[in-house]
Amino acid sequence: MIRESFENNMLELQNKMGEMVEETVAAMEKAFTALETQDMTIALAVIEEDATIDALENEINQMATWLMAKQQPVSRDLRRILSMMKMSTGIERIADFAVNVSKATIKIGKTDSLLPLTSLVQMKDISIEMLKKALKSFVEEDIVLAKEVVDLDEQVDEKNYQNYKALIGLIQQQPGQAEEIVQLLFINRYLERAADHITNMAESTAYFIKGQLFELN
């Protein structure tokens, strides 16, 4: 009976983490919709709605702390709880990057200039795929999926480098657009950092499954 209650609590934690991922994916998609359409109302909504994701992280951490104090889990169960706490922190930071993208959109404002967004959108899409895979790998305890997350991170790193070079070159060609392009450089960096956090989530899954630090690269 005690074990059944514990497993139900663990499932609730896992479901809350899944909800966090759904909210974060939605936030990132909306942030890029705002960027592509220059819609400040959507950008502001992303910023305001971030409180929902923050609240979910707090709920996960409070419940995990309560479980550890009450049940005193050891070994695999303890690793599972600690991994979820660490992953929820990573998800919250990714949501913060969606907020940062929205703030950059507001700084860019309405512009008639054609900004190079295609590669940034591709980076966003890869990052979202990584986040979904990271969650699935944890839920299904699938280390192969966790490895796929790390492989995708290499694609993000390559796009980050290519975008940086292209945007710096664009500033030199179009100095009148420097302020807008600098904001795109920030967005490029936010996406690269988001992918790094998702890679850390995959490594947390590997630790949970293997019981030791496990190199996925």
List each model region and its residues.
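Cytosolic, long alpha-helical scaffolding segments
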Residues: 1-217
